[in-house]
Structures are given as structure tokens and as C-alpha cells.
């Protein structure tokens, strides 16, 4: 059975992404920033988590991390993600949430569009490996 709860920083250490995330990236989510997020669990295992880092008044940076088990339930995870962003935007009275999506990640680009994010531009050499990313945003 699926359970949705508020994101806690320790979730970063407990999600099985199917790849190793750099510690400095994990630490960014553990810092005392204003993070509003949720974690989706199934039988105690983290399926996905996501949320918004508050940048300044009415603006935030959206993020999602999918565990290995999310691949077996893409529609369910997508519906939870859409609901999660709606709740966070409403609860925090946000005008804008933005995100970064790797240019070579076609699935993430499609998912972002499905979530209502619109393409705003190309961020050259933005990624940790120097790769290009798109800036996308959902503006109310």
C-alpha cells in the first residue's frame, strides 16, 4: 500500500536510486534550507520523493527523485507528483516553480511537460559534468 508523508532529510540516505548520488548532492538536500516536500513509500520503501526549495518570496526550485521501484508504477508516481506540486504551490502561495532538466533526458523532458512546466531556455554547461540543461517553469 502506498503512503505519502512529509519529506525528511534522512530520506536522501534511504532512497535506492539505482545509481550512486554524490555526497555533496545529498548534502544539499540536508542543509537547513526551506524545503517543502513529500516522500512516497510502499511497504516502508521509498518509491519517490520531491518538493520545492524556496528561493525567495513566491518562487521555488522544484525537484523529484525516483527510486528504482518507481519504474513499475509510472502513472501512479506521476499523479502523486502532480498533486504534490499543486499542494506545495497552493500552501506556499507560489507564483512560480522552476526546474532544471538535462537536455539528453527525453523522459524527464516529457514528464516535465506533462506536469505543466514550460521550456524557458538552455543553460549551457550547467550540470555537474558540464552538460547542458533546460530551464523549465510552471508559472501561476
Regions from the PLM with identified roles:
Residues 54-64, 72, 94-95, 132:
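A conserved beta-turn-beta hairpin within the catalytic core of GNAT-like acetyltransferases
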Residues 48, 121-124:
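A structural microfeature
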Residues 1-26:
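Short amphipathic alpha-helix that is part of the acyltransferase structural core
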Residues 62, 125-140:
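C-terminal "cap" of GNAT-fold acetyltransferases
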Residues 39, 45-54, 60-63:
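Conserved beta-strand in the GNAT
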Residues 32-34:
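Short, small/polar residue-rich loop motifs at catalytic or cofactor-binding pockets
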Amino acid at each position: 500500500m502506498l503512503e505519502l508523508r512529509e519529506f525528511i532529510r534522512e530520506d536522501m540516505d534511504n532512497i535506492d536510486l539505482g545509481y550512486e548520488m554524490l555526497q555533496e548532492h545529498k548534502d544539499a538536500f540536508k542543509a537547513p534550507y526551506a524545503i517543502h516536500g513529500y516522500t512516497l513509500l510502499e511497504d516502508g520503501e521509498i518509491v519517490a520523493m520531491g518538493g520545492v526549495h524556496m528561493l525567495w518570496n513566491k518562487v521555488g526550485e522544484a525537484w523529484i527523485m525516483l527510486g528504482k521501484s518507481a519504474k513499475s508504477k509510472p502513472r501512479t508516481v506521476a499523479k502523486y507528483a502532480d498533486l504534490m506540486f499543486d499542494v506545495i504551490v497552493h500552501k506556499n502561495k507560489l507564483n512560480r516553480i522552476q526546474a532544471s532538466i538535462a537536455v539528453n533526458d527525453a523522459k524527464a523532458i516529457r514528464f516535465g511537460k506533462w506536469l505543466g512546466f514550460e521550456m524557458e531556455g538552455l543553460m549551457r554547461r550547467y550540470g555537474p559534468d558540464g552538460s547542458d540543461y533546460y530551464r523549465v517553469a510552471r508559472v501561476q
